[in-house]
Amino acid sequence: VRIILMSLLDKVNMSLSLYHYKGLGIFWVDSIMDQYIIKGGMSLAGEVTVSGAKNAALGILAAAIMTDEEVLIDNLPDVKDINVMLEAIAQTGVYVDRINRNKVKINASKLHSCVVDDEYIRRIRASYYLIGALLGKYHKAEVALPGGCEIGARPIDQHLKGFRALGANIDISSGRINASSDKLKGAHIFLDIVSVGATINIMLAASLIPGKTVI
Protein backbone atom coordinates (compact mmCIF):
# COMPACT_ATOMS: atom_id res chain seq x y z
CA VAL A 1 0.00 0.00 0.00
CA ARG A 2 1.37 3.39 -0.91
CA ILE A 3 -0.11 6.41 0.79
CA ILE A 4 1.04 9.79 -0.44
CA LEU A 5 0.47 12.64 1.98
CA MET A 6 0.96 16.01 0.35
CA SER A 7 2.36 18.69 2.59
CA LEU A 8 1.41 22.16 1.43
CA LEU A 9 3.24 23.98 4.18
CA ASP A 10 6.62 22.28 4.44
CA LYS A 11 9.25 21.62 1.85
CA VAL A 12 11.11 18.62 3.19
CA ASN A 13 14.01 16.87 1.54
CA MET A 14 15.01 13.95 3.69
CA SER A 15 14.66 10.22 3.98
CA LEU A 16 13.44 8.49 7.12
CA SER A 17 14.36 4.82 7.38
CA LEU A 18 12.66 2.11 9.44
CA TYR A 19 10.41 3.56 12.13
CA HIS A 20 9.57 1.46 15.21
CA TYR A 21 6.41 2.27 17.15
CA LYS A 22 6.46 0.64 20.60
CA GLY A 23 7.88 -2.48 19.01
CA LEU A 24 4.52 -3.31 17.48
CA GLY A 25 5.13 -2.47 13.89
CA ILE A 26 7.59 -1.25 11.31
CA PHE A 27 6.99 0.77 8.20
CA TRP A 28 9.18 2.51 5.72
CA VAL A 29 8.91 6.25 5.24
CA ASP A 30 10.56 7.98 2.33
CA SER A 31 10.19 11.74 2.12
CA ILE A 32 11.20 13.61 -1.01
CA MET A 33 10.49 17.32 -1.25
CA ASP A 34 6.78 17.85 -0.44
CA GLN A 35 5.43 14.32 -0.24
CA TYR A 36 5.68 11.37 2.10
CA ILE A 37 5.51 7.87 0.63
CA ILE A 38 4.55 5.33 3.28
CA LYS A 39 4.82 1.63 2.48
CA GLY A 40 2.76 -0.24 5.04
CA GLY A 41 1.93 -3.88 5.55
CA MET A 42 2.80 -4.25 9.23
CA SER A 43 0.48 -3.95 12.21
CA LEU A 44 0.68 -0.71 14.18
CA ALA A 45 -0.78 0.05 17.58
CA GLY A 46 -0.51 2.80 20.15
CA GLU A 47 -1.92 6.10 21.28
CA VAL A 48 -1.48 9.54 19.76
CA THR A 49 -2.51 12.79 21.40
CA VAL A 50 -3.92 15.19 18.82
CA SER A 51 -3.15 18.80 19.65
CA GLY A 52 -5.31 21.77 18.77
CA ALA A 53 -5.16 23.33 15.31
CA LYS A 54 -2.41 25.94 15.11
CA ASN A 55 -4.01 28.06 12.38
CA ALA A 56 -7.33 28.19 14.19
CA ALA A 57 -5.62 29.00 17.49
CA LEU A 58 -3.74 31.97 16.02
CA GLY A 59 -6.98 33.59 14.86
CA ILE A 60 -8.63 32.89 18.22
CA LEU A 61 -5.72 34.49 20.09
CA ALA A 62 -6.11 37.63 17.99
CA ALA A 63 -9.88 37.67 18.60
CA ALA A 64 -9.30 37.32 22.35
CA ILE A 65 -7.78 40.81 22.57
CA MET A 66 -10.99 42.35 21.20
CA THR A 67 -12.93 41.84 24.42
CA ASP A 68 -12.32 43.23 27.90
CA GLU A 69 -13.57 40.00 29.43
CA GLU A 70 -11.32 37.14 30.49
CA VAL A 71 -10.79 34.48 27.84
CA LEU A 72 -9.62 30.93 28.63
CA ILE A 73 -8.27 28.91 25.71
CA ASP A 74 -7.52 25.21 26.13
CA ASN A 75 -5.77 22.59 23.98
CA LEU A 76 -3.42 25.13 22.43
CA PRO A 77 -0.65 23.48 20.43
CA ASP A 78 2.74 24.06 22.04
CA VAL A 79 4.53 25.33 18.93
CA LYS A 80 6.68 28.33 18.08
CA ASP A 81 4.01 30.36 16.27
CA ILE A 82 1.65 30.17 19.26
CA ASN A 83 4.38 31.12 21.72
CA VAL A 84 5.50 34.10 19.62
CA MET A 85 1.89 35.26 19.19
CA LEU A 86 1.39 35.18 22.96
CA GLU A 87 4.57 37.21 23.46
CA ALA A 88 3.40 39.77 20.90
CA ILE A 89 0.00 40.07 22.58
CA ALA A 90 1.54 40.46 26.04
CA GLN A 91 3.81 43.22 24.76
CA THR A 92 0.76 45.41 24.05
CA GLY A 93 -0.31 45.28 27.70
CA VAL A 94 -2.61 42.27 27.51
CA TYR A 95 -2.48 40.02 30.57
CA VAL A 96 -1.35 36.57 29.48
CA ASP A 97 -1.27 33.73 32.00
CA ARG A 98 0.25 30.56 30.59
CA ILE A 99 -1.43 28.07 32.93
CA ASN A 100 0.35 25.14 31.31
CA ARG A 101 1.78 24.21 27.94
CA ASN A 102 -1.66 23.89 26.38
CA LYS A 103 -3.85 26.31 28.32
CA VAL A 104 -3.74 30.10 28.49
CA LYS A 105 -5.79 32.83 30.15
CA ILE A 106 -6.03 36.21 28.40
CA ASN A 107 -7.42 39.53 29.63
CA ALA A 108 -7.10 42.52 27.31
CA SER A 109 -8.89 45.05 29.53
CA LYS A 110 -5.59 46.87 30.15
CA LEU A 111 -4.25 46.84 26.61
CA HIS A 112 -2.33 50.10 26.29
CA SER A 113 -0.58 49.96 22.92
CA CYS A 114 -1.68 49.34 19.36
CA VAL A 115 1.95 49.16 18.22
CA VAL A 116 3.37 45.65 18.02
CA ASP A 117 7.15 45.26 18.23
CA ASP A 118 8.99 44.03 15.15
CA GLU A 119 10.82 41.48 17.30
CA TYR A 120 7.73 39.30 17.38
CA ILE A 121 5.89 40.16 14.21
CA ARG A 122 8.62 39.37 11.71
CA ARG A 123 8.89 35.84 13.11
CA ILE A 124 5.39 34.61 12.24
CA ARG A 125 3.18 35.33 9.26
CA ALA A 126 -0.10 35.03 11.18
CA SER A 127 0.83 38.16 13.12
CA TYR A 128 -1.20 40.01 10.51
CA TYR A 129 -4.32 38.98 12.45
CA LEU A 130 -3.37 41.58 15.04
CA ILE A 131 -3.98 44.29 12.44
CA GLY A 132 -7.61 43.27 12.03
CA ALA A 133 -8.13 42.79 15.76
CA LEU A 134 -6.59 46.10 16.81
CA LEU A 135 -8.19 48.00 13.95
CA GLY A 136 -11.62 46.58 14.72
CA LYS A 137 -11.47 47.29 18.46
CA TYR A 138 -9.31 50.42 18.72
CA HIS A 139 -9.49 51.75 15.14
CA LYS A 140 -5.71 51.81 14.82
CA ALA A 141 -2.82 49.42 14.48
CA GLU A 142 0.88 49.66 13.72
CA VAL A 143 2.50 46.37 12.85
CA ALA A 144 5.61 45.32 10.96
CA LEU A 145 5.14 43.45 7.72
CA PRO A 146 4.62 39.83 8.70
CA GLY A 147 7.36 37.24 8.40
CA GLY A 148 7.71 33.56 9.13
CA CYS A 149 6.74 32.42 5.66
CA GLU A 150 8.81 30.99 2.83
CA ILE A 151 6.05 29.70 0.58
CA GLY A 152 6.76 31.92 -2.39
CA ALA A 153 5.44 35.44 -2.57
CA ARG A 154 2.34 35.70 -0.40
CA PRO A 155 1.40 39.37 -0.21
CA ILE A 156 -1.32 40.62 2.09
CA ASP A 157 -2.90 42.92 -0.47
CA GLN A 158 -6.31 41.25 -0.06
CA HIS A 159 -6.21 41.95 3.68
CA LEU A 160 -5.42 45.61 3.03
CA LYS A 161 -8.10 45.83 0.34
CA GLY A 162 -10.65 44.66 2.88
CA PHE A 163 -9.48 47.11 5.54
CA ARG A 164 -9.68 49.99 3.08
CA ALA A 165 -13.21 48.95 2.08
CA LEU A 166 -14.19 49.17 5.75
CA GLY A 167 -12.91 52.74 5.83
CA ALA A 168 -9.35 52.34 7.08
CA ASN A 169 -6.44 54.45 5.95
CA ILE A 170 -3.45 52.24 5.19
CA ASP A 171 0.12 53.49 5.00
CA ILE A 172 3.08 51.20 4.37
CA SER A 173 6.54 52.63 4.93
CA SER A 174 9.87 51.44 6.33
CA GLY A 175 8.58 47.89 6.50
CA ARG A 176 5.62 48.78 8.72
CA ILE A 177 1.87 48.88 8.22
CA ASN A 178 -0.04 51.76 9.79
CA ALA A 179 -3.81 51.33 9.75
CA SER A 180 -6.21 53.85 11.23
CA SER A 181 -9.71 55.21 10.88
CA ASP A 182 -11.96 57.69 12.64
CA LYS A 183 -15.00 55.68 11.65
CA LEU A 184 -15.15 52.17 10.28
CA LYS A 185 -18.36 50.82 8.78
CA GLY A 186 -19.59 47.64 7.16
CA ALA A 187 -19.02 47.11 3.45
CA HIS A 188 -19.36 44.64 0.60
CA ILE A 189 -15.90 43.25 -0.12
CA PHE A 190 -14.95 41.16 -3.13
CA LEU A 191 -11.64 39.33 -2.78
CA ASP A 192 -9.66 38.98 -5.99
CA ILE A 193 -8.47 35.55 -4.89
CA VAL A 194 -9.73 33.08 -2.31
CA SER A 195 -7.79 33.83 0.88
CA VAL A 196 -8.54 32.23 4.23
CA GLY A 197 -6.19 34.60 6.04
CA ALA A 198 -7.73 37.71 4.47
CA THR A 199 -11.24 36.45 5.23
CA ILE A 200 -10.42 35.90 8.91
CA ASN A 201 -8.63 39.24 9.19
CA ILE A 202 -11.51 41.16 7.62
CA MET A 203 -13.97 39.34 9.90
CA LEU A 204 -11.92 40.44 12.91
CA ALA A 205 -11.88 44.05 11.75
CA ALA A 206 -15.61 44.03 10.93
CA SER A 207 -16.91 42.23 14.01
CA LEU A 208 -17.28 45.27 16.30
CA ILE A 209 -18.09 48.02 13.81
CA PRO A 210 -21.57 49.22 12.78
CA GLY A 211 -23.19 47.96 9.61
CA LYS A 212 -23.22 44.64 7.79
CA THR A 213 -20.12 43.35 6.05
CA VAL A 214 -20.34 40.86 3.20
CA ILE A 215 -17.20 39.11 1.98
Question: What are these regions, as identified by a protein language model?
Answer:
Residues 14-215:
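Structural preference for solvent-exposed beta-strand-turn elements
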Residues 6-7, 136:
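Intrinsically disordered, low-complexity polar segments enriched in Ser/Thr/Pro and acidic
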Residues 7-9, 18:
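Glycine-centered signal
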